A protein has these predicted regions:
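ATP/Mg2+-dependent ligation/transfer catalytic cores
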Residues: 1-136
Length: 136
């Protein structure tokens, strides 16, 4: 999917029976986390972000997820009725300032640093899993 505007995404939600929207981000340990909202809450979430309690001191713990509209995808393993859509998000402070634990922001910063040196930064995910035999 390739959508350029919030209205494109809202039209897609309506046309494709999307019921839930997941806002995904990685914590400072690299573990993917998700916050899910009803599709009816999507316009506000795209405009204002999704607030959540972070993982810092109490007085600094409020954080905001800002969805990257270019990363929208339908989760294929979910039902076709009441579908689930996902965005990857950047993590920011409530005032819009950068959050130091935002892995996507850190990667963008490193990529810019590499380009200034005339280098290319290629990054990929490594999926690992274990298979266990059942003793039944």
């Amino acid at each position: 999917m390739s959508y350029n505007t919030q209205q494109d995404i809202l039209d897609f939600v309506e046309d494709n029976n999307v019921k839930f929207v997941r806002f995904a981000f990685c914590d400072i340990f690299g573990t993917q986390k998700n916050i899910a909202v009803l599709a009816s809450d999507l316009p506000k979430a795209m405009e204002d972000g999704v607030c959540f309690d972070g993982f810092m001191k109490v007085e600094e713990s409020d954080l905001v997820l800002r969805p990257d509209l270019s990363t929208v995808t339908i989760l294929p393993w979910r039902p076709t009725e009441g579908r689930v859509m996902q965005f990857f998000c950047d993590v920011e402070k409530p005032d819009g300032a950068a959050f130091g634990g935002n892995c996507r922001g850190f990667l963008r910063q490193m990529s810019r640093s590499f380009r200034k040196l005339g280098l290319t930064c290629n990054v990929g995910a490594e999926c690992e899993f274990y298979l266990f035999e059942n003793d039944d």
